[in-house]
A protein has these predicted regions:
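RNA/tRNA-interacting regions in translation and RNA-turnover enzymes
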Residues: 1-116
Length: 116
């Protein structure tokens, strides 16, 4: 089944911008349980070296970043590229596709850029 939702009227509900937010809303409307999102324990990354960055706008309350090194593959897996295509996005490269995939899943805008 393909379900197309025009989400333009829900701009005051950023929790609905991602697939998980929409699924949570449907689960509530249908009075059905929602499968929890698989979350990786991020404690394994707490000892990574800090990235030198500065938040210049006091209205920005948080900025998260990390570096990814030694990438040997530049193309996203086919299933990810297909899902992006069905969501109206074109595949670009592994890191850009990964951030777009996560944005669609969680509704959290992300961007990958070259640290150099």
């Amino acid at each position: 089944m393909i379900l197309e939702i025009d989400n333009k009227s829900m701009t005051n509900r950023p929790d609905l911008w991602g697939h998980y937010g929409i699924a949570r809303e449907f689960a509530a409307l249908a009075k059905r349980p929602l499968k929890p999102m698989d979350v990786v324990d991020l404690d394994q990354y707490k000892n990574l070296p800090a990235i030198d960055m500065k938040i210049e706008d006091p209205l920005c309350q948080r900025y998260s970043c990390l570096t990814v090194e030694n990438i040997t593959r530049n193309v996203a897996p086919m299933n990810m590229r297909i899902r992006l295509y069905y969501c109206g996005m074109r595949a670009i490269n592994l890191l850009a596709d990964l951030t777009n995939y996560l944005m669609l899943e969680m509704g959290q805008p992300m961007h990958a850029f070259d640290y150099r």
